[in-house]
């Protein structure tokens, strides 16, 4: 391993021990914000510190085995120990490389999930409803909280558009690769000839930013319209103009929120979603510029990408980005998404490692 990498690992290991000592300080414990921040840092450093300690121990084992090679009686055993220690050293070095990859600062944050019906009319709206249910089930299994921010229901069920905030540990990091195009192939309930129709939805996942990190938005750049909320089937319709539509004039981004009965609450929700959308657009633009200099298989979050096809007649789901096909559609639609998400995450890590080696 390069001396520069070893030096970096030593510094991180020392910082881990320093943070551990700070967490036992009475003054730090009394300051809850500082204590929480240090606890997060300690958790983030723990894996790399533990792995580096194991690597150091293996280097000692290699040195000891090499010294034993000079002893004729110990040589055979020393050769076996040396082989095992070198294999373990290689494995630990690979783990440390992954642990040293730059972390996406947004990965641990809550996220806004948008599902929009695309081509396919009523069937696309129904599929948007199925997708939202799928993500809700996944969130429930991970003990995340789902809060609907805004929705526009389809005429025959499902959603033309639905926006929700998902809160919990590592939400954005887990869901960010869901952004993109999702296509469904199935026979609609209204289809008398049994023909398979293709419909599509787009999904966007954006991190929820703390107020201090939201993009600066000039109030003069906003057009705010109020209107009456429309309830499903004519029920619970507000008689006041509590619904809010905010248009960000420079980008053309439009956000509506009518979930709350209070105009003030709807405006606050709409502004938080608007900030996340502007941030996502800026991030995508920056990533596109970076990707032009090297191969970037994943991570662009470009909504025009075709992520997956869900084929109901065949019970098949295909992720086109990594050529993965599973005949486990029923489980997928029930929210068992790790079998699809984990391979994407691993491919992304491999892509980052390849980029890192290119830089070196």
UniProtKB/Swiss-Prot annotation:
Keyword Electron transport included in the entry's annotation: no
Q: Which InterPro entries match?
A: PCRF (IPR005139), Pep_chain_release_fac_I (IPR000352), Pep_chain_release_fac_I_sf (IPR045853), Prokaryotic/Mito_RF (IPR050057), RF-1 (IPR004373)
Of the GO CC terms on this record, one is:
cytoplasm
Task: Note whether NAD occurs among the keywords.
Answer: no
The ranges of region (Disordered) come to 284-313
Q: Name one Pfam family in it.
A: PCRF
Q: What modifications does the entry list under PTM / processing?
A: Methylated by PrmC. Methylation increases the termination efficiency of RF1.
Location, primary (coarse class): cytoplasm
- GO terms, molecular function: translation release factor activity, codon specific
Q: Which domain of life is it from?
A: Bacteria
Q: Where in the cell is it found?
A: Cytoplasm
Residues that bear N5-methylglutamine: 235
Keywords from UniProt, A to Z, are:
Cytoplasm, Methylation, Protein biosynthesis
What is the similarity comment for this entry?
A: Belongs to the prokaryotic/mitochondrial release factor family.
The record, for PANTHER family, names: LD18447P
Q: What does this protein do?
A: Peptide chain release factor 1 directs the termination of translation in response to the peptide chain termination codons UAG and UAA.
Protein name, entry field: Peptide chain release factor 1
């Amino acid at each position: 391993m390069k001396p520069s990498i070893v030096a970096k690992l030593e510094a991180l290991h020392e910082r881990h021990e320093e943070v551990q000592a700070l967490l036992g300080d009475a003054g730090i414990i009394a300051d809850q914000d500082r204590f929480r921040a240090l606890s997060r840092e300690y958790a983030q450093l723990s894996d790399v510190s533990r792995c580096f300690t194991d690597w150091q121990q293996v280097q000692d084992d290699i040195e000891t085995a090499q010294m034993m090679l000079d002893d004729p009686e110990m040589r055979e055993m020393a050769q076996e120990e040396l082989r095992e220690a070198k294999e373990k050293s290689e494995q630990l070095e690979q783990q440390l490389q992954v642990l040293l990859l730059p972390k996406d600062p947004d990965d641990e944050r809550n996220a806004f999930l948008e599902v929009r019906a695309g081509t396919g009319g009523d069937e696309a709206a129904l599929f948007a409803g199925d997708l939202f249910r799928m993500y809700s089930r996944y969130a429930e299994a991970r003990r995340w909280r789902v809060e609907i921010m805004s929705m526009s229901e389809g005429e025959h069920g499902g959603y033309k558009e639905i926006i929700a905030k998902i809160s919990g540990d590592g939400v954005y990091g887990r869901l960010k690769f869901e952004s993109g195009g999702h296509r469904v192939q199935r026979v609609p309930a209204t289809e008398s000839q049994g023909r398979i129709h293709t419909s599509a939805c787009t999904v966007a996942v954006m991190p929820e930013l703390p107020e201090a990190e939201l993009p600066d938005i000039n109030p003069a750049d906003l057009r705010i319209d109020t209107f009456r909320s429309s309830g499903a089937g004519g029920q619970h319709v507000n008689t006041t103009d509590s619904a809010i539509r905010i248009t960000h004039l420079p980008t053309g981004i439009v956000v509506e929120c009518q979930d709350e009965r209070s105009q003030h609450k709807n405006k606050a929700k709409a502004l938080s979603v608007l900030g996340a959308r502007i941030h996502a657009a800026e991030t995508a633009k920056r990533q596109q510029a970076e990707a032009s200099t090297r191969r970037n298989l994943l991570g662009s979050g470009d909504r025009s990408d075709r992520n997956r096809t869900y084929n109901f007649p065949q019970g098949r789901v295909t992720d086109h980005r990594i050529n993965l096909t599973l005949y486990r559609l029923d489980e997928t639609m029930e929210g068992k998404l790790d079998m699809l998400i984990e391979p994407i995450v691993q491919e992304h890590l491999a892509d980052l490692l390849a980029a890192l080696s290119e830089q070196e």
